[in-house]
């Protein structure tokens, strides 16, 4: 029987999920996105050629792999078409490989307008959203007024539903935020223009995945963002609007949770965060600049500079707990090359001197803590491009071993560069 594997980020996103998903899809028949939207940014480097995907699953570059956008993904038709056209220009037969759930909520222009207006109104308290309408689209979903992909296939009914929801949102835009209204006729025309094209790729995702499972075909579920951005378990309110954790697989694709075999947590060898929000181990010094520059820490979606810091074991333990992480993939180990010493956060100290080994449940709690750091010797040798453990310096091996001890979870994959082949798979999640 084939295995069903989840690949997800265990930090604040940007851990290197895209490369690992692309690598593992060699053994998968299906790759499924189950949450988020085009706020994700998954970078693939194959033989030096870089491809950045925001919405379409990272398996799209593989022959004989079906890529699925599940019902938990909020779908912007214009963003999808941009990505499809980019891939088709590169010779990728997208229509043969991509399938979409009719239950995906639609992101429409008024969602983006609302997102931007709200961030502007928050001023110094801005959350740091991508401004791509993700949050407002999820709001419409849970308030049961949202439009879904399947609604596009009845033009008359779609027009009525769109008019109702736009009347509500345009009122908010003009009267509360003092912004311009979004044009109804233009929104309707643009949405219906691609209805038939989308319909040709729609399917019952839950049924398809269940049949694939019964046939023993391996399925890979691709997470977006990271555990610490989860709407429920992240640094609320500085979070995304979906469940980025393993539990989101079942709700976001209709796949039975008992059929998941392995959860691979992607963990950078240090930590980064993009946008606002608490970050106990943040380095606002020359070491932080070194990590940011060497690690090319700029968001694949927004281009924003990421905030670097030491690896936070307290947060990682929470990620292991929430996701039932089977094993880790450690990425960007090579970025630590050249540092005299490396540090790991092993606890959070509060003003009264007590030390916690669990994370607060909201952003406010993080303001009170300072990281308790454990120092280890660094290494001067290069780990870049290493493809076997024997090529790693002893200090790097000691660092990896210490992480495994602290997390009580094995590191099964080590990534030492952006390309597919700059990876060592110690334990294959599909084996």
UniProtKB/Swiss-Prot annotation:
Annotated residues for binding of Mg(2+): 14, 41
E.C. designation(s): 6.3.4.4
Transmembrane segments: none
SUPFAM superfamilies cross-referenced by the UniProt entry: P-loop containing nucleoside triphosphate hydrolases
Subcellular localization, as worded in the UniProt entry: Cytoplasm
Record note on quaternary structure: Homodimer.
Protein name: Adenylosuccinate synthetase
UniProt organism field: Shewanella pealeana (strain ATCC 700345 / ANG-SQ1)
């Amino acid at each position: 029987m084939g295995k069903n594997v989840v690949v997800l980020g265990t930090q604040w996103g940007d851990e290197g999920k895209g490369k690992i998903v692309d690598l593992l899809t060699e053994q998968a028949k299906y790759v499924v996105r189950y949450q988020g939207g085009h706020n994700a940014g998954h970078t693939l480097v194959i033989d030096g050629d870089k491809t950045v995907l925001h919405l379409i699953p990272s398996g799209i570059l593989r022959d004989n792999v079906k890529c699925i956008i599940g019902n938990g993904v909020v779908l912007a038709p214009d963003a999808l078409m941009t990505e499809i056209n980019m891939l088709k220009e590169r010779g990728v037969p997208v229509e043969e490989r991509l399938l979409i759930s009719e239950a995906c909520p639609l992101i429409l222009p008024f969602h983006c307008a609302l997102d931007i207006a709200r961030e502007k109104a928050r001023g110094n308290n801005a959350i740091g959203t991508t401004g791509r309408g993700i949050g407002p689209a999820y709001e419409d979903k849970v308030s049961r007024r949202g439009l879904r992909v399947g609604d596009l296939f009845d033009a008359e009914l779609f027009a009525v539903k769109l008019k109702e929801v736009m009347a509500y949102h345009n009122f908010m835009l003009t009267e509360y935020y003092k912004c311009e209204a979004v044009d109804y006729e233009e929104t309707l025309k643009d949405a219906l223009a691609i209805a038939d094209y989308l319909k040709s790729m729609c399917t019952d995702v839950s049924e398809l995945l269940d049949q694939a499972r019964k046939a023993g075909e391996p399925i890979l579920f691709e997470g977006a963002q990271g555990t610490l951005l989860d709407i429920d378990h992240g640094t609320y309110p500085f979070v995304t609007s979906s469940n980025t954790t393993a539990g989101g697989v079942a709700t976001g694709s209709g796949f039975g949770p008992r059929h998941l075999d392995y959860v691979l947590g992607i963990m950078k060898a240090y930590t980064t965060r993009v946008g606002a929000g608490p970050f106990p181990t943040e380095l606002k010094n020359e070491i932080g600049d070194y990590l940011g520059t060497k690690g090319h820490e700029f968001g694949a979606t927004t281009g924003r500079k990421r905030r670097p810091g030491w690896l936070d074991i307290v947060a990682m333990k929470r990620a292991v707990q929430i996701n039932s992480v089977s094993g880790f993939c450690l990425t960007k180990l090579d970025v630590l090359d050249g540092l005299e010493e490396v540090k790991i956060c092993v606890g959070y100290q509060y003003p009264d001197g007590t030390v916690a080994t669990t994370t607060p449940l909201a952003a406010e709690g993080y303001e009170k803590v300072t990281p308790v750091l454990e120092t280890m010797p660094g290494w001067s040798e290069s780990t870049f491009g290493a493809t076997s453990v024997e090529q790693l310096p002893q200090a790097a091996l000691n660092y990896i071993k210490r992480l495994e001890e602290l997390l009580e979870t094995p590191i099964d994959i080590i990534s030492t560069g952006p390309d597919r082949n700059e990876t060592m798979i110690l334990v294959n999640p599909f084996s």
